């Protein structure tokens, strides 16, 4: 394995009966913040479980931090923090005991685990709630507790499966800021899945896109953004169909959304052609600006 790569897989496949959950997944990931994006059922959770050695792959090979995912799952899990999508907390425990227990399961002695539990609960914003029972927690507080459990042993890699699922806007913002801080300030590596592109963009600099068990994109977000066409957005009044046709007659690529036209910028003459089209179509231009789409 290359020294720069911490996760590598080759032709990773996972079958559940006749269902192909992972289809020849090939990954080459270095340290940093990586988002795994895809709709529900794309194979994100299955990929994570294979990387952690929690489930056996049907075929293919993979290593995490140099350890074989098929035979050295214990070694991998001792170095990785895992925040699963499913509810993994004991509602009858308070937060401090839940996190301490997670630390002990990962090989920490009780005193060390307790000290670290206090530290990570403060880090995730639950200092004042650490002695409350988890059954009384909101969804956001439960997600924060799961994150604390994943961080308790100071892992080299943090894997978060849909960490913002079910969160309100405030809790979502705090969760994403905490993950970003883990990378930016702590020098950690975060691998997070989501079906929401905005979440990935706030934390990550690289992206893996999955669809039907396949990895279809694996590159930096910056490189991906360069491939998106720049557009001019024009809001008009009257004669939208005529305006659209006039733009196309001039050889421009246009997307129409009601009274809003988004025209691909071809060169420095594009704005002039848009204004010319509006004059020919006899429409009023209410707004004209450069449109910057997100991913």
Model-based region annotation:
Residues 60-71, 75-76:
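Conserved ABC transporter NBD signature motif
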Residues 230-295:
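Short, charged/small-residue-rich alpha-helical element at the C-terminal edge
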Residues 158-162:
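Catalytic Walker B motif of ABC-type/P-loop ATPase nucleotide-binding domains
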Residues 100, 104, 111-129:
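Conserved ABC ATPase "signature" region
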Residues 173-185:
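Helical segment within the ABC ATPase nucleotide-binding domain
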């Amino acid at each position: 394995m290359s020294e720069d790569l911490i996760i590598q897989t080759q032709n990773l496949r996972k079958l559940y009966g006749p269902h192909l959950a992972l289809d020849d997944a090939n990954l080459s990931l270095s340290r940093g913040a990586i988002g795994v994006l895809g709709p529900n059922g794309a194979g994100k959770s299955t990929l994570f479980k294979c990387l952690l050695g929690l489930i056996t792959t049907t075929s293919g090979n993979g290593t995490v931090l140099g350890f074989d995912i098929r035979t050295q799952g214990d070694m991998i899990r001792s170095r990785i923090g895992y925040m699963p999508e499913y509810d993994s907390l004991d509602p009858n425990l308070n937060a401090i005991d839940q996190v301490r227990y997670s630390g002990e399961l990962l090989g920490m002695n009780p005193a060390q685990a307790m000290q670290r539990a206090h530290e990570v609960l403060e880090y995730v914003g639950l200092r004042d709630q650490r002695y409350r029972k988890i059954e009384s927690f909101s969804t956001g507080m439960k997600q924060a507790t799961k994150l604390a459990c994943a961080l308790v042993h100071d892992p080299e890699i943090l894997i978060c499966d849909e960490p913002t699922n079910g969160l309100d806007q405030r809790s979502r913002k705090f969760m994403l800021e905490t993950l970003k801080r883990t990378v930016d300030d702590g020098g950690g590596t975060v691998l997070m899945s989501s079906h929401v592109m905005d979440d990935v963009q706030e934390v990550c600099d690289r992206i893996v896109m999955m669809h039907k068990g396949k990895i279809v994109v694996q590159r930096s977000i910056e490189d991906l953004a360069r491939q998106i066409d720049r557009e001019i957005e024009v809001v008009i009044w009257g004669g939208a169909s005529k305006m659209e046709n006039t733009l196309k007659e001039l050889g421009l690529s246009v997307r129409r959304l009601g009274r809003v036209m988004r025209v691909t910028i071809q060169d420095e003459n594009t704005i002039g052609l848009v204004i010319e089209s509006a004059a020919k179509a006899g429409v009023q231009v209410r707004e004209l600006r450069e449109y910057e789409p997100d991913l």
